[in-house]
Amino acid sequence: MERPELPIGLPDDIEEKKAAARNWFEGLRDTICASFEAIEDDLEGPLSDQEPGRFVAKDWSRENGAGGGGRMSMMEGRVFEKVGVHTSTVYGEFAPDFRAQIPGAKDDPRFWASGISLIAHPVNPNVPAVHMNTRMVVTTSRWFGGGADLTPVLSRRRTQEDEDSQLFHKAMEIACRNHAVADYDAYKTWCDEYFFLKHRNEARGIGGIFYDWLHSSEEAGGWDADFAFTRDVGRAFAMVYPKIVRSNFNKLWTEADRDEQLIRRGRYVEFNLLYDRGTIFGLKTGGNVESILSSLPPVVRWP
């Protein structure tokens, strides 16, 4: 989807809106971390004799005089081989070669951005990998973006008819249908197009939703409507993914399943380093490199 021209100008209470968004993202982070730790505690199948994982939080600040920072929350456990739930709030100026690509930054390079980003690589190949992020960006304009997508790593489960796929899609659809500013069909298509490895001519997973540059008019509800939708995307994810994990995490798997999982993880690496907009944005804005690249899986195999 082509980047639209967004209206220039910010509301008088933009600082209050920034604070509200940041508080939401950080609260969602804490909710998800607690939910994932509970999953670690409740495992009864393979590897249940190991100690359950716990998140380790690490705060970071931007260097070289740039503003803001964030918190990395990483866990390596018996259910989640590697999961990162990160929040950041950063501000400063875009580099000259990046300004024209960002709405409202061509003539004024100042920006502020806050968001949450999550990626989970489970141990059990029966449990799909997942990615979710939502964010608010302010230049001389303002907008929300984000989404969530599911990646089953076993080919027999990587279908639209699989119960995990249908459950995930339904949760994202409900989150969209409850908000007039959201367009589920467009966001689902956008996700399918975005999370596609062109060099392999294949999808990364089974999809989900993806949206960006969400800036609704005051007549349509404005910032409040956009923020309400973004919150519901986070809530939908926090409800549906733990349910999917719990329905699969006690199942047995084979060495062949593990091999297939590691090969599928390679597709994650390829996408994130070649195409991912969030990775590029983070590196271009002086983000925390360790946090940005923490989305990469811990063990990968290429055939």
From Swiss-Prot:
Source organism per UniProt: Rhizobium johnstonii (strain DSM 114642 / LMG 32736 / 3841) (Rhizobium leguminosarum bv. viciae)
PANTHER family (UniProt xref): COPROPORPHYRINOGEN III OXIDASE, MITOCHONDRIAL, OXYGEN-DEPENDENT COPROPORPHYRINOGEN-III OXIDASE, MITOCHONDRIAL
Binding site for substrate: 117, 133-135, 286-288
Enzyme Commission number(s) from the entry: 1.3.3.3
Keyword Signal: no
Lineage, top ranks: Bacteria, Pseudomonadati, Pseudomonadota, Alphaproteobacteria, Hyphomicrobiales
Cellular component annotations (GO), alphabetically ordered: cytoplasm
Family in the record: Belongs to the aerobic coproporphyrinogen-III oxidase family.
Binding of a divalent metal cation, residues: 121, 131, 169, 199
Residues covered by region (Important for dimerization): 268-303
Annotated site residue numbers, Important for dimerization: 199
Name this protein carries in UniProt: Oxygen-dependent coproporphyrinogen-III oxidase
